[in-house]
């Protein structure tokens, strides 16, 4: 499962404490492991004011490579229930790419693999920090 985690902490800039908020995206067994991964990465001697699980995501559709940006896409799928009613299910997924052109190729290839009617509804570029 993929987790987006929000960290609130203070940094010391020229003798003045400045509050900052950072977002991390990581793959972990559960939220506890995800939080531990973030704290291990940013350093044990840094005081964290707040750690918050923001959201969990379906698995990413591609592998992270060093320098990639983190994008969140929203996919809509039309499903037919047992009564014959069509329901649209929307879900966000992380995607890693160097630029928009590469992102569109990755998403286009992913949607082609879908067994049901899949559509791309939104793309958001994030400033999240990816933890492997």
Kindly label every feature range from the protein language model.
Residues 114-132:
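Glycine-rich, aromatic-bearing surface loops/beta-hairpins
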Residues 11-26, 86-93, 113-115:
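A cross-kingdom feature marking solvent-exposed beta-strand/loop segments within repeated
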Residues 2-10, 71-78:
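A short beta-strand micro-motif
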Residues 9-13, 64, 82-84, 130-131:
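A short Gly-Trp-Pro
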Residues 19-42, 96-100:
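Hydrophobic, ordered structural segments
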Residues 44-47:
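The feature represents the first ordered module of a protein
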Residues 49-115:
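Short, solvent-exposed interaction modules
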């Amino acid at each position: 499962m993929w987790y987006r985690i929000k960290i609130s902490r203070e940094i010391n800039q020229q003798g003045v404490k400045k509050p900052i908020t950072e977002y991390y995206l990581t793959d972990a067994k559960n939220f506890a492991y995800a939080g531990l991964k973030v704290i291990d990465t940013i350093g044990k001697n840094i005081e964290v004011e707040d750690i918050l699980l923001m959201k969990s995501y379906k698995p990413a559709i591609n592998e992270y490579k060093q320098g990639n940006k983190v994008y969140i896409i929203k996919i809509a799928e039309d499903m037919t229930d047992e009564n014959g009613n069509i329901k649209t299910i929307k879900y966000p997924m992380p995607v890693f790419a160097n630029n928009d052109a590469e992102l569109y190729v990755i998403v286009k290839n992913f949607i082609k693999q879908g067994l049901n009617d899949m559509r791309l509804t939104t793309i958001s570029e994030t400033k999240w920090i990816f933890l492997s």
